[in-house]
Swiss-Prot record:
GO terms for cellular component: periplasmic space. It is found in: Periplasm. The gene is azu. This soluble electron transfer copper protein is required for the inactivation of copper-containing nitrite reductase in the presence of oxygen. It holds the Pfam family Copper-bind. Its cofactor is Cu cation. It comes from Rhizobium leguminosarum bv. viciae. Residues 28-116 form the Plastocyanin-like domain. NCBIfam families: pseudoazurin. This is Putative pseudoazurin. In R.leguminosarum (biovar viciae) pseudoazurin is dispensable for nitrogen fixation. Cu cation binds at H63, C101, H104, M109.
């Protein structure tokens, strides 16, 4: 009996370990200046799989990451890091997530994370009333979602 129980525990541990190995951790830097200009998340667009995590790294000071109200999938709770805090988020629910740096959103400091294929919540992002610099960056990020991935 103890051998059978031990095999069950070992099998469960192996399955859990394999599942965690499949999930990836992506890194996004929060920068004063990057390849896309001033006040940017780099990369500004990221496509990940459900279950992956993203670590937001305040490479330069005075940055944070926060969900953009109404521009994340339904049922996902909002989150907000403190300034200068490295912050990790696990993305389980498929969809498009618009994130911002609270102090620098007026300068266009936003990021778009696509979780899985066929994000169903693109329309609210496309029509959202946001500052001009935010719209410019969001439109560039939205263009990286290929038409085959867009739900009509």
């Amino acid at each position: 009996m103890p051998l059978k129980f031990g095999l069950i525990v070992a099998t469960a541990a192996l399955i859990a370990s394999a599942a965690s190995l499949m999930a990836a951790d992506h890194q996004v830097q929060m920068l004063n200046k990057g390849t896309d200009g001033a006040m940017v998340f780099e990369p500004g667009f990221l496509k990940i799989a459900p279950g992956d995590t993203v670590t937001f790294i305040p490479t330069d000071k005075s940055h944070n990451v926060e969900t953009f109200k109404g521009l994340i999938p339904d049922g996902v709770p909002d989150f907000k890091s403190k300034p200068n805090e490295q912050y990790q988020v696990k993305f389980d629910i498929p969809g498009a997530y618009v994130l911002k740096c609270t102090p620098h959103v007026g300068m266009g400091m936003v990021a778009l994370i696509q979780v899985g294929d066929n994000p169903a919540n693109l329309e609210p992002i496309k029509i959202a009333k946001v500052p001009n610099m935010v719209r410019k960056r969001l439109d560039a990020d939205l263009a990286q979602i290929t038409p085959a991935q867009i739900t009509q």
